[in-house]
Amino acid sequence: MKSFVSVPQNSDFPIQNLPYGVFSTKADSSRHIGVAIGDQILNLAEIANLFDGPQLKAHQDVFKQSTLNAFMALPRPAWLEARARIQQLLSEDCAVLRDNAHLRSRALVAQSDATMHLPAQIGDYTDFYSSIHHATNVGIMFRGKENALMPNWKWLPVGYHGRASSIVVSGTDLKRPVGQTKAPDAEVPSFGPSKLMDFELEMAFFVGGPENELGTRVPIEKAEDRIFGVVLMNDWSARDIQAWEYVPLGPFLAKSFATTVSPWVVSIEALRPYFVENPVQDPVPPAYLHHDDPFTLDINLAVSIRPEGDAVDHIVCKTNFKHLYWTLKQQLAHHTVNGCNLRAGDLLGSGTVSGPEEGAYGSMLELSWRGAKEVPVGSEIRKFLKDGDEVNLSGVCEKNGVRIGFGECRGKVLPADI
């Protein structure tokens, strides 16, 4: 399938993708829901009346909102109908937009003229710890090889509740956090800027569909109906603050200062060709977490760092999302097994995605092995992030000549306020 809209070679956004986002322009500061196609954005508010199928005819107003929450809250058949209609309208064989110059001029906006915003109002944010390679590496560093994985790790998707208010969209700079740290040889903690600033290469999915009532669970057979779409996520971390504060309740200030997400939400339907077999799980998890259908995604991921004053990004790690041990379905089913209600717009992070080799580690903590190794970044070296470093995450699926991308997830570290 091809679009009448020109799609540059190696674009993240061919007609097979069609991710959703929220944008504004200098000419119109109002926020609108859009779909990326090539280097353009299709403004869905301008074509809302064209969604006239059985699922969406009575819900055209969802495309005129300033966030995706109302659309996300519709059931999955509505998402499928919207995607099919947008593909039809953008296809080279459909005259509705192609031959209507006036409508086309209103509905298509150059991405270069747009400012992207968070795609949804995020009510709650949960971060999992689903990479066995990352969990093993961190366990070896802090507890030794014999106790790398905690006893519960292979029985359930470990997670914690994060801070939704400090989630920001790609391109937002962040200040180095300050807090308490304690050096190994110090008798008391000290206060000041974190010296061990880190990124975490993650992906996250937005919850959609009608809310499950408090006290009811989402069975794993129905979990896909609640997974709206996927974004890149950088779970910025202050490792020295984390090391001092995390016992016994887990991360707090070391994580809550900022989390960056990419602006374009790639639907599960767009990613369907890239599902691969799930990892072997030993021991076999409890029945409520068991599913045989492939729901592991083959997404090539990379992290680059651009030091201040440098003109280019330098890749420091390459890995793949398929290395995760726990699937998205398992994460969602586990989250609700106690009766927790999930709402449209909630965000669930994967945890750091690391592969089995050193170059596939998804954090500076692992790449530098807790500061014991130097990581080349162009002509410079790093053990952790310095002020002025700009970090970018990228993700691409490729199969049968079709490339599906996620855009950028970029943020720059600014000096701390002391």
From Swiss-Prot:
Summary of the tissues where the protein is detected: Highly expressed in the intestine and the hypodermis.
Residues given in the record as Ca(2+) binding sites: D127, E200, E202, D235
Record-given protein name: Fumarylacetoacetase
Active site, renumbered: H134 (proton acceptor)
The gene coding this protein: fah-1
GO molecular function, one term: fumarylacetoacetase activity
Lineage: Eukaryota, Metazoa, Ecdysozoa, Nematoda, Chromadorea
Binding site for Mg(2+): D235, K255, T259
Cofactor(s) for this UniProt protein: Ca(2+); Mg(2+)
